[in-house]
Every structure is written in structure tokens, then in C-alpha cells.
Amino acid sequence: MKDVVFGICAVRSAGVILCLRISAAFILVLSLTGAGCSHDKADSSASETAAPQSASPATSSAKAVEPVGPALHIDAARAMQYTKEIVAFGPRWDSSKPIEQVRSYIKGKLKGVQVEEDSFVAETSAGKMPMTNIVAKFPGSKDGIIVLGSHYETNYWLRNTPFIGANDGAATSALLLAIADQLRGKKLEGYSIWIAFLDGEESFTRQWHTNDALWGSRHLAKKLQDDGASKKVKAFVLADMIGDADLDICRDENSTPWLEDLLLQAATHLGYQSHFFASTTEVEDDHIPFARAGMPVLDVIDIDYGYNNSFHHTVQDTVDKLSVESLKISGDVILETIRLINGMGDNPPPAPPQRVPS
């Protein structure tokens, strides 16, 4: 995911910080009008304003959606344990021994579930890299698919450091495993759910290059498009950086608006709205290839990790910066959002219009 900082506020992208100078007069205007940043985050442009946390959960939808299916809740303590077990393998950059161990670990936690491996060789700036997406499939009772995703590898360009990506990759992979625990053995009332553990999200160089990142998501999105499955995908929901103890999920301009509305409705219903949408920005992440392929997408992401984003892509991204409560909030809100997607009916609003980077 790309790292960008606008002025004094952080917007996440992958590996580079850019600064936009803001005049003193402009800052004065912001202070007088009450506009600006929340938790040191900025909107993606000067014309955008932070979304109030008490706002209606349906800003583009006509009315609130009724959820379908029983309410599910993750075992957040188990999700934290999974996180610790993943980082214990060490830095898991592509072509390393630990990433092979993590793949085996993920598949081992999915015993009894239909699992497919989507393996390929990526032509990266560092050479040819074998990669594998791991997709767990849980059949539903309705014709359609909801895909949940997260990346599991760490940065190749940090391979000579002890960077373990506790929040950036490990926690979200652990969260998906905890969600899988809740789905295993159940007859789902709504759409089928596919859980995709994606490889190769991070750029292979410190400076973010879209054509040298998002490898797993680009490959899987194309595969779904080529075999026609993309037409059945009702939503692709990405989780990224959601274990941060100071949890603050942003509204992403590159996500599908009605899905963002459902996410906020879910958070509000569960009493967690104070952790959502204090700021608005654009995020370039694993959801983008699926959006380009015409699928509705949602990026559930906390873009500000540490003061001024100081923990992101550093050796400070360790388990002690995370919390069980943040994992619980993120996991339960995603599960509630799934119930709301099921409640949208067979013909939810189409994905466009939404901003998708070219």
C-alpha cells in the first residue's frame, strides 16, 4: 500500500512520503472554520472534508439495510495469538523460507475447508518471484460471492532488517483466519464467502510503483475476470492495517460508496462508529485491481500507524503496537457488513462511479 503525507497529515501508500506545503494563511483559514485533520490525518484534497462520525450510515443509499443471517463475532484473543504465531516465523518476504512456512501455516489453519492455491511467477524489479494466493471457499445459499482479502507477505526491500509486519500483513491475515473459524462448518444464509490471502501486495522497491506491486491481487482479479466469476462477486472487502491499538478507519475515495455506507452502518449498529471515518482520503491498495475489473470494492484500513505514521514499514511494526480490542472491532464490523451486503438483495447498486487510479 502506497504512503503519502499531505501537509502535516498522513495518507497511506507504499514506501514513500511526499509532502505538500500548506501556507500559513491556509492553515489559519482551517483553524477558523474548524476544518482540517483528525488524529494527524488529512483528506485527499483541500476541497474534501472529514466525514463526521455521527453521520448517517447511508450517505448514498436511500435507506438503512436490514442484515441477513445470524450475527457472528470473532474470537479476538485467538486472532491476536494467530498474529503472534505468524510474526514468529520472521520476516516473510517473497522467495524467503519464512513465507513458505507462513503459507503452510495458513493452509494448516484452514483444514476441513475447500482451499485453492493460485500460484504464479511475478516478473518483479528484483527478478522472477514465485507467488501464491491462498483462497478458502465457504459455500452460501445464494448465487453470488463476497470476497474478503488481505496480504500476508512483508516488504522485499526491507529483507535485510528484522521487519516483521505485525500490523502490516500479519494482523489482517490472522483476522481472516479468525473469520474463517466463525464460518467453518456453518450453512451460510447469504452469498458464498471466499477468503483470499494475497501475496505480493508490497512494492519491491522503497518507492511505490503500481506495476511492481499488487501482484497477487492483480493476478487473482484477472483470473476471476477471465473465468467469469467476477460477474458473481457482490463485493471485494479488503482488510489492511487494522490491528493498530489506536484504531481509526478512514473513508477511502477509491472504495465503492455504497459499501462504505454499509461499513459505517455496521460500525454504528455495533457501537463502534467513533473508530470510523474521521477522515477521508484515497488509498491505493489490493482492492484497486478488483475495482478495475468492475467489482464493487471496500478497503477497511487505518492509514495512520503511530504518530505521523512513524511505525509503518519500520522495525517498530511489532505486536506490542496492536490490541485485541482493535482486532475485535475490525473483525466484528466486517462480519456485520457481510450481513448487510446479503441484505442488499440480488441487485445491489453497480460499482461505478468511484475513483480508481489509472
Can you say where each PLM-predicted feature lies in the sequence?
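Short, low-complexity, disordered segments immediately C-terminal to signal peptides
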Residues: 38-62
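Solvent-exposed loop/turn segments at secondary-structure junctions
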Residues: 92-94, 121-124, 141-142, 152-156, ...
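C-terminal motif of bacterial Sec signal peptides marking the signal peptidase cleavage site
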Residues: 33-36
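A non-catalytic alpha/beta surface segment that caps or lines the substrate-entry region
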Residues: 39, 70, 81-141
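N-terminal capping segment at the start of a domain
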Residues: 58-103, 157, 307-318, 342
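Active-site-adjacent substrate-binding region
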Residues: 70, 119-121, 235, 242-358
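Acidic/histidine-rich catalytic neighborhood of metal-dependent amide-processing enzymes
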Residues: 163-266, 274, 279-282, 286-287
